[in-house]
Amino acid sequence: MTPSLANFLWSLVYGAVVLGLLFGAIVFVSQRDRVRRR
């Protein structure tokens, strides 16, 4: 595997992790707000 390909794969992995954390935080906050608003 070439270093550039490895860097590309790692960037994809880190991007997926960041998106997952953001999505999880948004879902968590929306769930908590829905409970509090009721």
Swiss-Prot record:
<keyword id="KW-0604">Photosystem II</keyword>
<dbReference type="Pfam" id="PF06596">
    <property type="entry name" value="PsbX"/>
</dbReference>
<comment type="function">
    <text>Involved in the binding and/or turnover of quinones at the Q(B) site of photosystem II (PSII). PSII is a light-driven water plastoquinone oxidoreductase, using light energy to abstract electrons from H(2)O, generating a proton gradient subsequently used for ATP formation.</text>
</comment>
<dbReference type="GO" id="GO:0009523">
    <property type="term" value="C:photosystem II"/>
</dbReference>
<comment type="similarity">
    <text>Belongs to the PsbX family. Type 1 subfamily.</text>
</comment>
<keyword id="KW-0812">Transmembrane</keyword>
<keyword id="KW-0793">Thylakoid</keyword>
<feature type="transmembrane region" description="Helical">
    <location>
        <begin position="8"/>
        <end position="28"/>
    </location>
</feature>
<comment type="subunit">
    <text>PSII is composed of 1 copy each of membrane proteins PsbA, PsbB, PsbC, PsbD, PsbE, PsbF, PsbH, PsbI, PsbJ, PsbK, PsbL, PsbM, PsbT, PsbX, PsbY, PsbZ, Psb30/Ycf12, peripheral proteins PsbO, CyanoQ (PsbQ), PsbU, PsbV and a large number of cofactors. It forms dimeric complexes.</text>
</comment>
<dbReference type="GO" id="GO:0015979">
    <property type="term" value="P:photosynthesis"/>
</dbReference>
<keyword id="KW-1133">Transmembrane helix</keyword>
<dbReference type="InterPro" id="IPR009518">
    <property type="entry name" value="PSII_PsbX"/>
</dbReference>
<protein>
    <recommendedName>
        <fullName>Photosystem II reaction center protein X 2</fullName>
    </recommendedName>
</protein>
<keyword id="KW-0602">Photosynthesis</keyword>
<keyword id="KW-0472">Membrane</keyword>
<dbReference type="InterPro" id="IPR023431">
    <property type="entry name" value="PSII_PsbX_type_1_subfam"/>
</dbReference>
<dbReference type="GO" id="GO:0031676">
    <property type="term" value="C:plasma membrane-derived thylakoid membrane"/>
</dbReference>
